[in-house]
Each structure stands twice: as C-alpha cells, then as structure tokens.
C-alpha cells in the first residue's frame, strides 16, 4: 500500500506532554491524545484537510467489548439476582478479594444490568486485558464504577463519605452518580448491544473521541471531517438488525462486506487494535517513571489541593510494585 509509517519513542511522547494542556484547556485523560497529535502533525505536512474514520465502531458495533458484554450479561441474567448479589458480597469480604481476578468476579456478580457491566471502565484496551486474565469476565456494579471514577479525590475513596471541594458538600462519587442520573432509564431500555452502543454515542464518542481528534488536529491547523457521522449514515446504521453488525467476535460486518470489494480478506481479517501507546511499560522505564514521580510528590499534591496525596501514592505503589493498573 501507499502509506506512511510513524514510530513514536518514549522521548517524543514526553516532549508532547507539556503541550497538551494548551490544546485541551481541561484535564483529558485519554493517552491516545499523544499519538493522535503526532499523526495529525505528520499529516499536516502534506495536506490541510483529512478524513477521520471515527464513529464506525460505535455505529456498527466494532468494539470487542460489545461482544464480551453481550456474552457476559447473557450468562449473568440467567442466575437469580439475590443469589448473585449474595455471592458478590461474600467475595468482597474475603481478605484476598483485592487480587484482580477475584475482585473482578465479585463485582461482576453485583451488576444489575448490562450498562452496569459496561460502565465499570471506559478504558477499552485495559479492560480487554483484564477480561482475558479473569476467564472472560468483566467487573461490574455501578457503585464499583462510581468508586473507580472518583478514586484519588479527597473524600472520593472508600466508604467514609468525606466531603471535598466539588461544591455543595458533594464528593467525587456524588458527582459521577449525579451525571448518570440525568439520563432516563427507559432511554437505554433496549437490547444489550444497542444499549451499550447508545451510551457510547451519547457519552464516550462526543466527550472523548471527537474532542481528542478535534483538539489535536486543530493544534496543527489540520481540518478533520468525519463522514461516518453524516446524518444518513447514522440513521442507516441504527436501522440495521444486530445480525448485520456483529456475529460472535466479529464486528462492523456491513462495513467489512463493503471493504471486501476493494481489499483482500487476508488483509482485513485480523484482530482489532486500538490506537494506543504502551503507557504502562513507558511509565516503568527510568525516564518517564522519574518524571511521573516528580508530579506525584506528596508535598506537591497537597499544595495543589486537588488530589488526595495518600490515595495517589497508594495507586502509584500498586502500579509500580504489583502491576495493578487503574486508568
């Protein structure tokens, strides 16, 4: 094929990081903003307008986690809710429940719906690896999700109910719960696959994917256009029955069938890969580890007043000493 290759080094990634705050003007935790910026910069050397394929996974069910959630929830809902919750609660009391596989299985049993399973973690790649390590299961439970989103903020960790500076005496946990309460439950009253697709189209896609591409591309004066989000394409995608979208572990079936007309199957039928960087490995290597630890200095964190220095220290220690990753 006629294409260009860009190899990103740890040093290049570190050089980009100081520029990110000026691009986004707010905290933005998707690490793929780094390669997206570098690809945009390379693209801008050749063109001023580029097409983006964003929206294809959400509209045509391409994410691997869609298939996993369907299978997981299919198994869960066949078991009595009372029995599942009792078992999940008992697992949480075990002294070794902090081990990743055991903890994930315990939280999974507490889930009430497919969305609780799905909302546990937005980091698709991290979640994929975690699922694979615990026999095809994923953590669940809205409380577990909310706790994970609020962990590290003052008062956000644990069950102490401590208050912080989010305003109105609210904890970080309260803020996340309030956010999800804005959506009427009946909005997601549809099949498991359609429910998680809809959530992504309402939240993840506009608040993460589109923001990331827009900010990084415009930082280098590159205009991006998103043909998948054409009104007619969106309406067509939502009109398709699920068997046209996914079959077992294969998604985007309609798009694949179209592309097969132009690209040999052997070039297409391969495992899906996210647009990510080896952030975990990099953070354990000397240069970026030293940089990260300078930012996580307890005295610095306390002087800033945003994070709980002790909680941040525990999270970093879990990562560096035990390999526990909490994006």
Task: Spell out what each predicted region is.
Residues 18-22, 44, 66-68, 282-284:
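Short low-complexity, flexible loop/linker segments enriched in glycine and/or proline
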Residues 38-97, 204, 210-233:
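Active-site adenylate/phosphate-handling loop in enzymes that bind or generate adenylated species
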